[in-house]
Amino acid sequence: MIEKRPHTTVILAMSADGKIADFNRSPARFGSLNDKLHLEKQIAAVDAVLFGADTLRAYGTTMIISESILLQQRTKVNNHPQPVHIVISHSANLNPDIKFFQQPVRRWLLTTSGGASVWEKSSGFEQILVFETPQGEIDILAVVKYLASVEISRLAILGGGQLVASFLELDLIDEIWLTICPLILGGNTAPSPVGRKGFLSALAPGLQLLEVSTVEQEVFLHYGVIHKSELNLKSQIF
């Protein structure tokens, strides 16, 4: 595991059968007002939020802090009213007319050299960051090292499942917040919190339940991720 990187928390809402969207991948607006306030509180506690291009395309906007008490708390510690909002996309094929580009947030783009060329003459993003592997993919390890170097110490990942899987595979996630919402979506193609190929059960990331609460019809689960280094240490002890 990288020694210096942001403390990273995944924050997602899902149906009771573990889907973060329906089979049409429509915007997941099934969370209650309580879930919205929970998400806003978590966002207020971080320096940056990261989300994939498909998540942005689905919503057209990003979640901003609007609660006055949360804004005041950030101001007291000399933070910007809003965390940096970072889109990660290989192609950077984004509609410049979506509402996201009018929202009062600092926007960064994480992409490839090809994706950067799409936006190099636009003012849509405050920063365009290119970290590429020799295979032309986005270098996630280089990304988290860079974020730490610019004093982003706490990072929230807001989806989608492909992005969450990429970070889990590299053992870069520390906490997971899941809101279980009272509906069943079903569907073989409906996305889950963790996408890509998946993990064999013997190699699956382990979790430790930190807290659980029920608010009206929703259950809020807070997990800590057990890192591979912790598992290795335990195996050496026993």
Regions found by a protein language model. Give the residues of each.
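Enzymes that bind and transform nitrogen-containing heteroaromatic metabolites
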Residues: 1-238
